[in-house]
Amino acid sequence: MGKTGSVEHTKQRIESELMPPSMYKVILNNDDYTPMDFVIEVLARFFDKHEPQATDIMLTIHHQGKGICGVYPFGIAETKVLQVNQFARENQHPLLCTLEKA
């Protein structure tokens, strides 16, 4: 009887090891003060977006209130959020970067 529990535990552990990591959307939120050019710079610098794609995302942020910059595993998403928010504050902009589960 003891083996059944052990087999189930091993099966659950293997299944959890095979699961892909949870993914998170990194989002830029609109505000009335951050210049559009700065948002484009953030998208290029931190998310490797070329100007046409960065402009499209910036316009989505402007018109819809937020835009997705990318989808990443939690650790990467969290780092990008921290980097963007720090960069915005260093440049005296209220731009807010957040993450949510994809």
Swiss-Prot record:
Intrachain disulfide bonds: none
InterPro entries, A to Z: ClpS (IPR022935), ClpS_core (IPR003769), Ribosomal_bL12_C/ClpS-like (IPR014719)
Biological processes, Gene Ontology terms: protein catabolic process; proteolysis
Subunit structure: Binds to the N-terminal domain of the chaperone ClpA.
Function per UniProt: Involved in the modulation of the specificity of the ClpAP-mediated ATP-dependent protein degradation.
Protein family membership: Belongs to the ClpS family.
Record-given protein name: ATP-dependent Clp protease adapter protein ClpS
Protein's organism: Shewanella denitrificans (strain OS217 / ATCC BAA-1090 / DSM 15013)
Annotated gene: clpS
